[in-house]
């Protein structure tokens, strides 16, 4: 028999909620349906494999996890498999570090939020100023949300905010072993 940590965490072998693919409305629907079918008490296990997607959907799923934890007093474990990129890492940030696991060979991708926007300046000057201010407000709010998520992700880990803030613009890929050594996850199975 090979040396393995799996025997320490037998619950991870039979997850209650299995998510894969793009983080989008369809994943959120699947997530809600699977949660509704879960046992009403005891620890839950949620797995995800994703190349990313909509960060706001990831935040909504994470908020559901937080509400279950706070209102029902339940422990919920996170298991990232193969790829936990972008919005997947946003979802992972909803789980305390001591409830996060990755499978061998899994990679995390942490990066800044992206925006593509064309601003058409046309009309009375005050309307132009208002349009520019609205776009700036959108960007500033998105940066604030991103920073909140980054702080949640690294809370309880060895990663200083400044390091994540410095590496995120150029896509920070983190191997499972590095994630464990940085304290971003409890263990690798």
Regions found by a protein language model. Give the residues of each.
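Terminal-region recognition feature
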Residues: 1-189
């Amino acid at each position: 028999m090979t040396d393995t940590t799996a025997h320490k965490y037998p619950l991870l072998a039979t997850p209650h909620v299995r998510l894969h693919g793009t983080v989008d409305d369809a994943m959120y629907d699947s997530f809600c349906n699977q949660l509704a079918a879960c046992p009403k008490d005891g620890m839950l296990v949620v797995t995800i494999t994703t190349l990313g997607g909509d960060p706001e959907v990831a935040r909504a799923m994470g908020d559901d996890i937080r509400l279950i934890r706070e209102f029902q007093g339940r422990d919920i474990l996170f298991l990232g498999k193969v790829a936990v990129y972008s919005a997947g890492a946003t979802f992972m940030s909803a789980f305390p570090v001591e409830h996060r696991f990755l499978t061998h060979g899994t990679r995390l991708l942490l990066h800044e939020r992206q925006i593509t926007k064309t601003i058409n300046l046309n009309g009375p000057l005050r309307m132009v100023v208002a349009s520019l201010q609205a776009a700036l407000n959108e960007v500033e709010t998105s940066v604030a949300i991103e920073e909140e998520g980054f702080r949640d992700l690294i809370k309880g880990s060895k990663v200083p905010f400044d390091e994540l803030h410095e590496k995120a613009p150029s896509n920070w890929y983190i191997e499972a072993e590095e994630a464990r050594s940085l304290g971003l996850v409890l263990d690798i199975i």
